[in-house]
A protein has these predicted regions:
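Active-site loop/lid in soluble adenylation, ligation, and acyl-transfer enzymes
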Residues: 1-145, 258-286
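Coil-to-beta-strand transition motifs
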Residues: 18, 93-95, 195-199, 211-214
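Intrinsically disordered, low-complexity acidic/polar segments
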Residues: 30, 109-110, 211, 225-227
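Surface-exposed helix-capping loop/turn segments at secondary-structure junctions
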Residues: 57-63, 187-199, 212, 282-286
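Conserved metal-phosphate-binding beta-hairpin within the catalytic cores
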Residues: 100, 199-220
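Anionic ligand-binding catalytic core segments
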Residues: 114-117, 122-172, 216, 220-281
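A long amphipathic alpha-helix within ATP-dependent nucleotide-binding catalytic cores
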Residues: 166-200
Length: 286
């Protein structure tokens, strides 16, 4: 079988009335796929998504059918697909990346320093970098093709984008995406905080099922789609340590002549962070 779509990290296969999403061990930084692979990274992404999908079915249905390769065609019953593959319902994906920020960091912090706003939302004066916001904010963006950058947009603009594709439904879908995104974030951030992890921000993607219902798709609250910070070292006023590919990003910035290859030590540290986040949140080892 050949994938019908190959992203920087995931491969998607058509399985008739379902899709099979395979999370590889590839790692991308600054929109480039690095030459190294991070062992077990794909399994962390898939199993962590499963964990959150199971936890949040009371808020919104999701696209997951199974992560058991025995439920999938023969082609996937091999070690390289075991643990990192998910059979999913087919959805008509909505053209909005649903970003929610509970803390002021990253591009949001840069925008706030310049203007006092983040994606059209005015924030209180005097916030420090990495400070918790009074309430989580919803900052949607448009989905870019591979190689392009997503564009942050206002909530009002998200209504326009959705209305263009779904005449008469733009406002309804935009409100549903906003409300679901914030409800998911609040529930999961509260759970994570009890397990020693701050979810600073994250992104969700939604689609429509065959009956036109909004369904959560893609991945959910992984170190690739979220900023996870260790709660025990959290201190506003500067950037925070994180459970993701920050080691890789920092090394690449400090070594511009790198030919997109990481030293083994940086690969190992990155793997350790992914596994640690999974262990803290789920209580399980991989």
């Amino acid at each position: 079988m050949k994938p019908i779509k190959e992203g920087k990290v995931r491969e998607i296969y058509d399985n008739g009335d379902s899709l099979i999403m395979v999370a590889t061990d590839r790692i991308s930084c600054f929109d480039v796929i690095l030459r190294n692979k991070v062992d077990k990274k794909g399994t962390v992404l898939t199993q962590m998504s499963k964990f959150w999908f199971d936890m949040t079915r009371d808020i919104v249905p999701n696209h997951m059918i199974s992560v058991d390769v025995n439920d999938m065609p023969e082609f996937f019953r091999k070690p390289e697909f075991d643990g990192n593959s998910m059979m999913c319902r087919k959805l008509e994906m909505l053209p909005i990346e649903c970003i929610v920020r509970g803390y002021i960091t990253g591009s949001g912090w840069e925008s706030y320093q310049k203007t006092g706003f983040v994606c059209g939302i005015r924030l209180p004066e005097g916030l420090k970098e990495s400070e918790k916001l009074p309430e989580p904010i919803y900052t949607p963006s448009t989905k870019a093709e591979i190689g392009d950058h997503d564009e942050n947009i206002s909530y009002e603009k998200s209504i326009e984008v959705l209305e263009k594709q779904f005449p008469g439904k733009g406002e309804e879908y935009a409100k549903a995406l906003k409300d679901l995104t914030i409800a998911l974030y609040k529930k999961c951030a509260d759970y994570a905080a009890e397990h020693g992890i701050i979810i600073a921000d994250t992104k969700f993607e939604f689609g429509l099922d065959e009956e036109g219902r909004v369904v959560l798709g893609d991945e959910m609250l992984t170190p690739d789609s979220s900023r996870f910070w260790p709660a025990d070292s959290y201190e506003p006023g500067h950037s925070q340590a994180s459970f993701d590919k920050q080691f890789a990003r920092d090394w690449l910035k400090q070594n511009p002549d790198n030919d997109w290859t990481l030293p083994d030590e940086i690969v190992q540290k990155t793997q350790d962070k992914y596994l640690q986040a999974y262990r803290m949140l789920t209580g399980k080892e991989l």
